[in-house]
C-alpha cells in the first residue's frame, strides 16, 4: 500500500567474486572500481526514486553483509579485492540512500569480524543472513533511529 515501509536489498550479487563488479572490472581494466560502484549504486537508487514517486513508500535499503566464503578456495588478492568492493559499495549505498531520504539497514557492520570478512555468527550460507541475523540487524536499526532523535 502507499506510504508503507519497504525493505529493498540491492547489490548483493554485484558484490561477489564471480559475478558483478569484480568480473566487470577484470573485463574492463581501464575502469576504476570506485567509479563502477558509484555508477551502479546511483543507477539502483535513481530507479527506486523514479518508481516510488507515486506510492511514496518509506524505503529502507539493506546493505551488503561481509562475505562468508571459504578463503581457501580463493587467492588472497581476490579476497582482498572482494572485501574492498563490499566496503566501498556499502559506503556508497549508505551515503546515497541517506541523501535520497531512504533508511539504511547496515548488515555489514553486524557481520564484520574486523577485517571485512564475516564473523560467522549471522549467515546461513556464503552470502545470506539467517532470520536471527535479520532480526538483529533490525534491532540495531531501531536503536540507531532512537539515538538519531536526540
Q: Which stretches of residues belong to each language-model region?
A:
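Alpha-helical cap/lid subdomain in secreted, periplasmic
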Residues: 1-131
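Conserved catalytic region of serine esterases and O-acyltransferases that act on ester linkages
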Residues: 121-128, 132-150
Amino acid at each position: 500500500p502507499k506510504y508503507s515501509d519497504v525493505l529493498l536489498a540491492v547489490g548483493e550479487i554485484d558484490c561477489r567474486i564471480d559475478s558483478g563488479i569484480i568480473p566487470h572490472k577484470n573485463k574492463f581494466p581501464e575502469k576504476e572500481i570506485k567509479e563502477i560502484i558509484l555508477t551502479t549504486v546511483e543507477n539502483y537508487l535513481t530507479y527506486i526514486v523514479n518508481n516510488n514517486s507515486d506510492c511514496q513508500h518509506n524505503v529502507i535499503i539493506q546493505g551488503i553483509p561481509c562475505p562468508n566464503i571459504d578463503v581457501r578456495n580463493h587467492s588472497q588478492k581476490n579476497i582482498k579485492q572482494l572485501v574492498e568492493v563490499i566496503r566501498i559499495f556499502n559506503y556508497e549505498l549508505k551515503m546515497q540512500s541517506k541523501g535520497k531520504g531512504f533508511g539504511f539497514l547496515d548488515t555489514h557492520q553486524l557481520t564484520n569480524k574486523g577485517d571485512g570478512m564475516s564473523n560467522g555468527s549471522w549467515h546461513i550460507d556464503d552470502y545470506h543472513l539467517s532470520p536471527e541475523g535479520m532480526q538483529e540487524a533490525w534491532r540495531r536499526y531501531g536503536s540507531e533511529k532512537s539515538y538519531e532523535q536526540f
